[in-house]
Curated annotation (Swiss-Prot):
The gene is anmK. SUPFAM superfamilies: Actin-like ATPase domain. This is Anhydro-N-acetylmuramic acid kinase. The keyword Kinase applies. It comes from Brucella melitensis biotype 1 (strain ATCC 23456 / CCUG 17765 / NCTC 10094 / 16M). Gene3D superfamilies: 3.30.420.40. One of its GO terms (biological process) is 1,6-anhydro-N-acetyl-beta-muramic acid catabolic process. Belongs to the anhydro-N-acetylmuramic acid kinase family.
Length: 373
């Protein structure tokens, strides 16, 4: 039996809807025992503060800067994560001393890969003090210091999952995470690992629904299911410079914008943006060394029926199968949080978090800042 560490992963993604929490035991390599998971939603008021913080973050020139609301926001965000950990431990009947490490992502407020600048607010030292558990945080920065894009970081975890795929899943396999921004991880039959952001995920759909006063997202894709794809609008998105050439890069929330209000009706806009999210995955996958046979989909976007219908139809045209991560034996909601727990253990062990084929860094790079209570 390898030396396993109990780790909690905390993820607050680009959708800014709350905190995902996951517990696993791992050696930081191929031994993974997935345990419990949970989530905690942000209040509408706190979500509004996060969005205001994105505006303040535009002024950042150095990643240590916290202009405007960001200093207080970072403090309050960290305390919310501490509450989430305490509640989770209570629900699971665990004590802080039974957890070896927390992997703390924080909230990305700025990501400019072309400037080697990424900023995630979240005070790891404060979280360690509040929870009484060692914390590893700020896991993207070291990758950027070595010429990487700082994203995506989840591929190391995907590679470990791919080593234990359920029977019947044919490779090459692509793990797709559809959060605010989508990313994919290709695991070749020869073990090749390639990853990059693939395009907008839920982000544009969520913004479109909010623009029309219809909530924060499209539940189940119901609005999109009643609409039709506007091909001209979809074509415009898919001709974006992000998709051109062979050089892949990571994305920021500001790289794509929603159509103007009135350009499309609510349902057609939602359907068009769902199609764009799906088509972006296949378009980005065209840069891979071999055509995928299976797409394993995690993240909130897999719950949008229209997006999944479009993705399934597009993939089937290429002879590929699309499967919800839950139906493949994984946890589609907790996969990113699980990854952050796994990466925290890898960081403590000095193992790489990123590779030249996943972020463009100049060599396999570990990372993260460890702090103790």
């Amino acid at each position: 039996m390898p030396d396993l560490k109990r780790a909690i992963g905390l993820m607050s993604g680009t959708s800014m809807d709350g905190i995902d929490i996951a517990l696993l035991a791992t050696d930081g390599e191929n031994w993974i025992e997935r345990r419990a998971s949970a989530s905690m939603d942000y209040s509408d008021g706190f979500r509004a503060r996060l969005k205001a913080g994105l505006v303040d973050a535009r002024a950042i020139k150095d990643r240590a800067e916290r202009p405007g609301l960001l200093r207080q926001l970072e403090h309050d965000l960290t305390l919310l994560h501490a509450v989430a950990v305490h509640d989770f431990l209570h629900e699971q009947g665990l004590q802080p001393h039974e957890i070896d490490v927390i992997g703390f992502h924080g909230q990305t407020v700025l990501h400019r890969s072309n400037e080697s600048l990424t900023v995630q607010i979240g005070d790891g030292a404060l979280l360690a003090r509040e929870t009484g558990i060692p914390v590893v945080y700020d896991m993207r920065a070291e990758d950027m210091r070595h010429g990487g894009q700082g994203a995506p970081l989840i591929p190391a975890y995907h590679a470990a999952l791919a080593a234990n795929l359920p029977l019947g899943l044919k490779g090459p396999v692509v793990f797709v995470n559809i959060g605010g921004i989508s990313n994919l991880t290709y695991v070749g039959e020869d073990g090749a690992l390639i990853a990059y952001d693939s395009g907008p995920g839920n982000m544009l759909i969520d913004q479109w629904m909010e623009l029309h006063g219809h909530g924060r997202f499209d539940p189940g894709g119901a609005t999109a299911m009643s609409g039709s794809v506007d091909r001209n609008t979809a074509h415009r998105y898919l001709e974006h410079e992000f998709f051109k050439g062979n050089h892949r890069r990571s994305l920021d929330r500001g790289d794509f914008a929603i159509p103007a209000k009135g350009e499309l009706n609510l349902a057609d806009g939602a359907r068009t943006l769902a199609f764009v999210s799906a088509a972006a995955i296949l378009k980005s996958a065209s840069h891979l060394p071999a055509r995928p046979r299976t797409y394993v989909v995690s993240g909130g976007g897999r719950k949008n029926g229209a997006l999944m219908d479009e993705l399934t139809a597009l993939a089937e045209r290429q002879g590929a199968h699309v499967i919800d991560a839950d139906n493949a034996g994984f946890d589609g909601d907790a996969m990113e949080a699980e990854a952050w727990a796994y990466l925290a253990v890898r960081s403590l062990c000095g193992l790489p978090l990123t590779y030249p084929s996943t972020t463009g860094c100049d060599k396999p790079v570990s990372g993260g800042v460890p702090v103790r209570p």
